[in-house]
């Protein structure tokens, strides 16, 4: 406990210095300081999380260790900025055995729900949920214009996901590209027959000077004219023909692969429709696409080893790294649900989920997992998404609502705010977006140690999760719903309610 307190005191000593300089930097109308989201003043309306931490220490409060589950793309476990904060399972050795008998082999830092146990399969690009659902239903409804009797609802769903996935648009692109390729071939056959025209060295600039006539040729020329205009005049004719042929080949391949190629997620070995079936995945939490999860982790617990002003919101917390979000495409409901259960079972009191999607065919699994988190008093923080839309009209999943539409009391939906206290233009909003937090020009660390600034509700969520972890560490008797209510009631009111860590901690001190 003494070393834990020592770490927090050191954090405060470093953090107070930038606070004293904040007014100087802003008065000169220079760019925002890198730690603005952890402080506050006019023009830099952050969360006062640094001040809150120092306030608690001055009041003689002693925190308990706390773990945060980070459900994301994984993280760079070698990165010095976050490595000291990664929870290391004390009884698990990298020996291919389940040493601590928790059902997971070699889960030293957390768990990877995107890979097979032997590591031969690793899901990196999985497509949107709408595309995957279209792919699943295509064998049953291919070519149908009307619903089979008794299948009206599912057929309507099939048509809906086809539209969401852009299948009809892609099929139209296939038809247009096919016509263009035919036009290219027609014109190419004419050029081959012309005397004194060297087709293999002919440039587009030379092509447009040729006197070609005939209805079919003119129609073909009109069809491919846009491609010729877009290309450089020095481009060889035969190269443009090849490019269009390759484009069509790629389109045909992609459409054919919808039926031909299996959904690799089905090869991981679990029952995707049962949450109890969790014996899949592996312990490799680093991998392709880990940049997002690494940055989110640094916003939570970054140590400031590269730049002392670029630190996490609550550095003493320990992270459970849960790789459940692919590099490209939508996360699977089953993986998110399984990751929530893992985090709960392994001691997390706060879970950060900087993820979201437009469709959730197995929403019941996530609801089951959120009920499990609620039962074990775990607070879940979810980013609201970056579509700039009203979630009351078009939701993002998970919604944080039960199947009956009732909000989970242990769930926080977080939008992004700007330094001026406004809602960020990209941030989703709605009556169930409880809080906002800085999500614009937030500094953190990427794999390899690169310091950079990012925007997004994905960044606002860990700001809130870090504050929630701080409160739960210093006030362990407060339940998850009580912390949610506390953060909501003490939020700074303005255009949008912005989380205020100092006000929340002051209120918590009076409460218990």
Question: Which stretches of residues belong to each language-model region?
Answer:
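Extracellular S/T/G-rich loop segment that most often corresponds to the catalytic His/Ser-adjacent loop
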Residues: 378, 399-473, 477, 481
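Mature extracellular/periplasmic domains of secretome proteins
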Residues: 53-63, 288-290, 311-314, 330-352, ...
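Subtilisin-like serine protease catalytic core
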Residues: 54-68, 73-331, 408-410, 428-432, ...
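Active-site glycine-centered loops adjacent to acidic/histidine catalytic or metal-binding residues
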Residues: 72, 385, 456
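C-terminal subdomain of the subtilisin-like protease fold in secreted/lumenal serine endopeptidases
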Residues: 344-355, 362-364, 376, 409-413, ...
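A cross-family glycoside hydrolase active-site/sugar-binding cleft signature
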Residues: 323, 352-356, 383-384, 415, ...
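Short acidic, glycine-rich surface-loop motifs adjacent to enzyme active sites
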Residues: 27-38, 145-167, 171-174, 181, ...
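Bacterial Sec-dependent N-terminal signal peptides
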Residues: 1-26
């Amino acid at each position: 406990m003494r070393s834990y307190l020592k770490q927090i005191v050191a954090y405060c000593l470093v953090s107070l210095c930038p606070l004293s300089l904040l007014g100087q930097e802003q008065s000169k109308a220079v760019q925002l300081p890198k730690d603005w989201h952890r402080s506050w003043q006019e023009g830099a309306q952050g969360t006062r999380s640094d001040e809150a931490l120092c306030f608690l220490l001055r009041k003689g409060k002693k925190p308990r260790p706390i773990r945060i589950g980070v459900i994301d793309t994984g993280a760079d476990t070698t990165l010095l900025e976050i490595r000291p904060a990664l929870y290391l399972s004390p009884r698990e050795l990298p020996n291919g055995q389940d040493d601590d008998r928790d059902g997971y082999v070699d889960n030293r830092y957390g768990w990877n729900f995107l890979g097979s146990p032997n590591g031969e399969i690793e899901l990196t690009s999985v497509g949107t949920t709408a595309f995957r659902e279209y792919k699943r239903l295509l064998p049953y409804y291919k070519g149908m214009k009307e619903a089979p009797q008794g299948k009206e609802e599912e057929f309507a769903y099939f048509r809906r996901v086809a539209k969401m996935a852009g299948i009809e648009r892609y099929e139209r692109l296939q038809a247009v590209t096919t016509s263009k390729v035919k036009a290219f071939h027609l014109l190419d056959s004419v050029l081959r027959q012309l005397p004194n025209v060297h087709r293999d060295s002919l440039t587009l600039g030379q092509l447009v000077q040729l006197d070609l006539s005939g209805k079919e040729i003119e129609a073909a020329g009109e069809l491919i004219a846009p491609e010729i205009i877009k290309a450089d005049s020095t481009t060889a004719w035969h190269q443009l023909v090849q490019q269009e042929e390759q484009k069509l080949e790629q389109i045909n391949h992609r459409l054919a692969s919808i039926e031909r190629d299996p959904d690799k997620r089905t090869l991981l070995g679990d029952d995707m429709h049962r949450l109890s079936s969790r014996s899949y995945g592996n312990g490799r939490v680093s991998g392709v696409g880990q940049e997002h999860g690494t940055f989110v982790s640094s916003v939570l617990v970054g140590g400031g080893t590269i730049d002392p002003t670029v630190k996490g919101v609550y550095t003493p917390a320990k992270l459970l790294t849960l790789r459940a979000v692919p590099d490209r495409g939508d996360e699977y409901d089953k993986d998110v649900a399984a990751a929530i259960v893992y985090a709960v079972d392994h001691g997390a009191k706060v879970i950060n989920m900087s993820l979201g999607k437009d469709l959730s065919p197995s929403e019941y699994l996530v609801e089951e997992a959120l009920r499990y988190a609620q039962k074990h008093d775990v607070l879940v923080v979810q980013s609201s998404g970056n579509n700039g839309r009203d979630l009351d009209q078009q939701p993002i999943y998970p919604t944080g609502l039960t199947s009956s539409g009732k909000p989970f009391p242990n769930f926080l939906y977080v939008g992004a705010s700007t330094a001026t206290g406004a809602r960020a233009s990209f941030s989703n909003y709605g009556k169930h977006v409880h809080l906002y937090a800085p999500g614009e020009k937030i500094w953190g660390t990427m794999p390899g140690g690169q310091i950079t600034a990012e925007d997004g509700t994905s960044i606002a969520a860990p700001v809130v999760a870090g504050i929630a972890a701080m409160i739960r560490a210093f006030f362990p008797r407060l339940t998850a719903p009580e912390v949610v209510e506390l953060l909501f009631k003490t939020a700074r009111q303005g255009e949008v309610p912005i989380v205020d860590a100092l006000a929340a901690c002051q209120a918590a001190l009076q409460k218990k």
